């Protein structure tokens, strides 16, 4: 389930996501160009993979025009780090940060997250 609402025009977008984590290999690395992601874990556990976007990965799906998201193919040449997220943790991803949310920690589980998208040019 995903609830999405625009605040202050399109300067802020609030999402409440209830998703199930899964194996890292089933989650797609993504990057945004217009928005900064502030992700807050309300309930659950996940890893978020992340690495600097050096624009060397192959594009799997380009939805920048519609949804400000670009998905990359797997790239074994990048040094992807895994950030553990538990209740009350938050992470901030800028346009130069590739991130892969919803990777399971141990077993797959249902998680609830709040994602605030802040348009870069408002800062």
Please give the residue ranges for each predicted region.
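Short, small-residue-biased leader/transition segments that mark boundaries at the very start
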Residues: 1-3
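A short beta-loop-beta micro-motif enriched in histidine and acidic residues
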Residues: 8-9, 25-36, 56-64, 78, ...
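Conserved short histidine dyad/triad with adjacent acidic residue
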Residues: 14-32, 42-58, 95
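Short acidic (Asp/Glu) patches
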Residues: 15-34, 65-79, 100
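Short, conserved beta-strand element in jelly-roll/cupin
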Residues: 33-46, 52-54, 63-74, 117-118
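Conserved metal-binding segment of the jelly-roll/cupin
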Residues: 84-102
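A short hydrophobic beta-strand segment most commonly corresponding to one strand
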Residues: 90-92, 108-123
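Short proline/glycine-enriched turn/loop segments at secondary-structure junctions
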Residues: 103-107
């Amino acid at each position: 389930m995903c609830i999405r609402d625009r605040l202050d025009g399109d300067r802020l977008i609030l999402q409440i996501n209830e998703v199930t984590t899964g194996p890292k290999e089933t989650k797609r690395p993504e990057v945004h160009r217009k928005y900064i992601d502030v992700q807050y874990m309300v309930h659950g556990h996940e890893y978020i993979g992340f690495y600097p976007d050096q624009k060397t990965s192959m594009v799997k799906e380009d939805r920048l025009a519609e949804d400000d998201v670009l998905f990359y193919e797997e790239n074994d040449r990048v040094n992807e780090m895994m950030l553990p997220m538990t209740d009350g943790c938050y992470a901030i991803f800028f346009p130069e940060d590739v991130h892969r949310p919803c990777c399971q920690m141990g077993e797959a589980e249902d998680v609830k997250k709040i994602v605030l998208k802040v348009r870069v040019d408002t800062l």
